[in-house]
């Protein structure tokens, strides 16, 4: 929903009728603050986050000649989601745990490396792996945010630490996985952790000194404790507080700003997307209802001060984990014969939004994937018209589309002003939503209020679940408000997108490496199998007259960890890296690394033990070790663990803390010995059932 600027924030404005969008503005106007194109200086190439490269040497005619120029391997496993930055002939890329690598962009030689030395135990608070989506570079400084909440500035020439500042208390279950954004001397960063019961905020720091300049909290705190003394105090009091009920602060509230931001230098507005509530089920966190601002909202603030300007809430009172943290693109479209500055987003809830980015006015909202939780977005109010039963009242489960994975997750999309199309890594899925019986808050643990049912020990059911999910590259026309084309993929979890002036769209395809598609038709023109999945956005740059395509690759991310059993190629413990292609490249592709395999112990668990073990596994183990006990990204696969051989061995890391120093927490305060034995029985059963998936 749209709200007025701060000075009239108590007045609710009508969104008005949806206007007819006529045509995109010329390409030169669409890529705001766009560089010449030889470098890739920002996360989304430019401040508008278009991810559109003007380079055209690699085009639809020449792309078949692309070959590997070089590759660089990281020195540790876990998830890789970064978009590289290329400035001054150096490629800056972050790997797992926020380790930064500076690499010669011509030949792949390491120039320097910075390891922030994050304690291994902090990984327990990372819902979706210890990933890092990238760095920011400006004025000779490289900025990176670490999993344990430090924002650091490094010397771009040698990696020396220039300053480091904590952005939150590392003892709290916050994390950071997002890339910082730099805008006119300020570095902006948010955080994650809503599933663990935190309160979200975004902060701006002085790029030269690391001093905090402003902070904007996205949900209200405990009213009894008074205001925060932050720039968000007034909008929280006037707009957000009336939309919450009960004692939401006991659960944290959520609303973390864990990914997308964009900046309009002309308006000098910073836009950020806000995440889901904590817990997910609104009836738990806010009994009595309410929109729960600013959850699932796009918020515009003044860059220099953080002062609130407007917001639009994509999913009022979110109960489905429908974040608005997905990639936002700034562009100009012609509406009723006049140019309008717009913001475009395809958030998890399945609707594609076009907003006036100066005012927050809703211009269009249309389904881009199958959606059943709402029939449409009402153009007058800007609110979704919800389906009966969508909020899964007690005793009435609901099969929701999209699922909590969303129609589009964090993987970046791209905008091509020449074709007038937005290219989206879209996905179709269904989620089972029901209230968690006897919910109890477990501080520092996974607290969504929605149970994770265990994967049953039945190969046919697993195959059905696999078939219920799909992914595709979607070309969306914001003028016609419809899909121009869709190209299906083999699996549901695919990578970010790069569009180029050569008429190409590059995307990482799950289980298949990097592929290039015709931007006008969606035809696949080229593919290179890296055997490591590419999830972050590919980039393009030019050196010595040659155009390069680069992408970071690796196993990890939330789906590799939690749902690898559903993917066409499951991950492993291999370290990720960077792959770079050019026309005529002849470097050999590194060979795929084999997965460690062990014979499963005899399956002697009773049906009761396996059923109970599956429930416990889904609650405490699945998020890291994978649904159905099939792991997929740097964390050991328990089916092949030496500790699985005997019950007494299996208890040692689980309840005795044997591997705590390596990041495996002890569950002694939660699980008894017989609980550990039941979990082992489930893992052994799944090892026998899923052995063919390896």
Predicted feature residues:
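Blade-level signature of beta-propeller repeat domains, shared across WD40, Kelch, NHL, RCC1
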Residues: 539-595
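C-terminal capping alpha-helices of c-type cytochrome domains
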Residues: 145, 668-694
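Short, conserved, GDST-rich strand-edge loop motifs in beta-rich repeat architectures
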Residues: 189-200, 245-246, 272-292, 397, ...
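Repeat-blade elements of multi-bladed beta-propeller folds
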Residues: 40-44, 79-99, 124-150, 175-196, ...
């Amino acid at each position: 929903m749209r709200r007025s600027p701060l000075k009239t924030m108590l007045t609710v404005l009508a969104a008005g009728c949806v206007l007819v969008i006529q045509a995109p503005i010329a390409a030169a106007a669409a890529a705001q603050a766009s560089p010449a194109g030889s470098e890739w200086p920002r996360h989304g190439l430019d401040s508008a986050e278009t991810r559109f490269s003007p380079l055209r040497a690699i085009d639809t005619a020449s792309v078949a000649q692309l070959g590997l120029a070089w590759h660089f391997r990281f020195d540790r496993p876990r998830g890789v989601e970064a978009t590289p930055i290329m400035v001054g002939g150096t490629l800056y890329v972050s790997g797992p745990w926020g380790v930064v690598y500076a690499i010669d962009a011509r030949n792949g030689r390491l120039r320097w490396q910075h390891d922030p030395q994050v304690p291994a135990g902090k990984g327990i608070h990372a819902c979706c792996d210890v990933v890092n989506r990238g760095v920011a570079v400006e004025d000779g400084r490289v900025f990176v945010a670490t999993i344990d909440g430090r924002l650091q500035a490094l010397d771009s020439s040698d990696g020396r630490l220039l300053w480091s500042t904590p952005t939150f208390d590392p003892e709290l279950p916050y994390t950071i996985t997002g890339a910082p954004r730099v805008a006119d001397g300020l570095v902006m960063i948010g955080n994650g952790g809503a599933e663990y019961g935190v309160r979200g905020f975004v902060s701006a720091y002085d790029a030269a000194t690391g001093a905090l300049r402003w902070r904007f909290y996205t949900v209200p705190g405990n009213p009894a404790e008074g205001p925060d003394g932050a720039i968000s105090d007034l909008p929280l009091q006037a707009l957000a507080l009336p939309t919450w009920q009960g004692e939401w602060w006991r659960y944290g509230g959520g609303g973390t700003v864990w990914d997308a931001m964009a900046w309009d230098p002309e308006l000098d507005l910073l836009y950020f997307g806000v995440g889901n509530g904590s817990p997910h089920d609104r009836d738990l966190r806010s009994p009595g209802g309410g929109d729960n601002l600013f959850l699932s909202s796009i918020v515009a603030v003044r860059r220099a001060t953080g002062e609130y300007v407007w917001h639009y809430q994509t999913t009022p009172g979110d109960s489905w984990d429908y974040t608005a943290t997905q990639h936002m693109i700034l562009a100009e479209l012609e509406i009723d014969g006049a140019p309008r500055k717009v913001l475009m987003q395809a958030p998890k809830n399945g609707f594609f939004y076009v907003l006036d980015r100066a005012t927050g006015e809703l211009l269009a909202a249309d389904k881009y994937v199958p959606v059943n939780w709402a029939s449409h977005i009402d153009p007058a109010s800007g609110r979704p018209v919800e389906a009966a039963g969508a909020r899964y009242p007690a005793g009435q489960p609901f099969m929701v589309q999209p699922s909590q994975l969303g129609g589009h997750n964090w993987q970046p999309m791209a905008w091509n002003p020449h074709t007038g199309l937005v290219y989206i890594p879209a996905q179709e899925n269904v989620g089972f939503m029901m209230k968690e019986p006897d919910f109890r808050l477990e501080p520092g643990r996974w607290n969504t209020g929605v149970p994770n049912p265990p994967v049953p020990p039945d190969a046919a059911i697993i195959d059905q679940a696999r078939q219920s999910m799909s992914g595709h590259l979607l070309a969306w026309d914001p003028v016609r408000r419809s899909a121009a084309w869709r190209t299906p993929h083999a699996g549901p979890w695919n990578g970010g997108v790069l569009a180029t002036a050569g008429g190409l769209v590059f995307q990482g395809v799950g289980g298949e490496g990097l592929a290039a598609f015709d931007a006008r038709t969606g035809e696949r023109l080229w593919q290179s199998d890296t055997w490591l999945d590419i999830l972050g956005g590919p980039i393009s740059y030019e050196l010595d007259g040659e155009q390069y395509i680069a992408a970071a690759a690796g196993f990890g991310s939330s789906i590799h960890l939690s749902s690898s059993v559903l993917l066409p190629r499951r991950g492993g413990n291999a370290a990720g890296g960077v792959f770079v292609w050019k026309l005529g490249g002849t470097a050999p592709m590194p060979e795929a690394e084999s997965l460690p395999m062990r014979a499963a112990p005899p399956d002697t668990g009773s049906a009761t033990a396996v059923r109970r073990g599956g429930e416990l596994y889904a609650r405490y183990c699945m998020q890291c070790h994978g649904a159905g006990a099939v792991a997929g990204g740097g964390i050991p696969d328990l089916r092949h663990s030496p500790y699985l051989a005997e019950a007494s061995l299996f208890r040692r890391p689980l309840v005795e803390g044997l591997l705590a120093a390596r990041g495996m927490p002890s569950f002694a305060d939660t699980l008894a010995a017989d609980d550990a034995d039941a979990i082992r029985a489930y893992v052994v059963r799944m090892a026998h059932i899923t052995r063919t998936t390896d």
